[in-house]
Amino acid sequence: MLVIKNGTLISMAGIYKEKYDVAVENGKIAKVEKEIVPGPEDTVIDAAGNLVTPGFIEPHCHLGIIDADGQDGNEMTGPIHPELRAIDAIDFHCSLFDRALEAGVTTVAVGPGSGNIMGGTFAYLKTAGATLNERIMKEEAALKMALGENPKVS
């Protein structure tokens, strides 16, 4: 178990708790208390003077699809491509996954760009994981559609 001690906690409801401890087990918050006594096998992080929050969720991004090394966000062979899947285009070795995780983003919805009226499906992923299977939460989660300026100019 991971025990984060003495942090200033901020809940998603905006509640602040100073000098609180958080226990994390199997990647999930197990308990939040004023004092958690770690066991001999536990990993302890002293978060004194630091903020501790739940992992952030990015509900719409192009991580691993559109980055400095490539542009796989839009399929420009036609305006309607519901059959395309973001999961098939994502570069899971993209360094931006690590940067997102370092910033506290633990979950992302990765999808195509707005160059098509119908551009394909999003995938829900974790930003951490040693293998692809550890990262994938849902391969097809939402269908990207765009109206207005973006598909008009593409």
Label for each model-derived stretch:
Residues M1-K5:
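Extreme N-terminal starter segment of soluble prokaryotic enzymes
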Residues D21-A23, A109, F122-Y124:
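Short beta-strand scaffold segments in enzyme catalytic cores
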Residues L9-T53:
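Histidine-rich, glycine-flanked metal-binding segment
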Residues I45-D46, A109-V110, M145:
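General beta-strand structural signal in soluble alpha/beta enzymes
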Residues A123-S154:
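Metal-coordinating catalytic core of metallo-dependent amide/deamination hydrolases
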Residues D67-Q71, G119-Y124:
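Short acidic, glycine/serine/threonine-rich loops at helix termini
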